[in-house]
Amino acid sequence: MMNVPIENGTFPHVIMGEFDANAGISQKKQPTKDPLLKGAAGHGCGHNLFGTASLGAAVAIKNLIASGKLKGTVKFYGTPAEEKFFGKLWMARAGLFDDLDACVDWHPAD
């Protein structure tokens, strides 16, 4: 998990950067859908987009805060195990969501 706060106000907002490392899928190590074995089970529902697009959004907000065009606090949380549903549970138990005003997460389509 990564917590990189950019502060210029109160009430933190978090952008979640989902990532997974699922074993046993038929997908070459690249950002586009390309199976190891044609027709084999794989996973390509946009997981290659989670981390990079979310980090890009956090950087854009950081730049607005730094320029004085926006007040607030933004944090970026690298979020593990989205596919298995327990990553956010670990984060909640660690108290990472306790002081937030809002938390943004999303899921692209395949």
What positions do the PLM features span?
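Acidic/His- and Gly-rich active-site-bordering loop/insert found
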Residues: 1-43, 48, 52-72
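Histidine/acidic-residue-rich, glycine-tolerant segments that coordinate divalent metal ions
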Residues: 22, 34-42, 48, 67-110
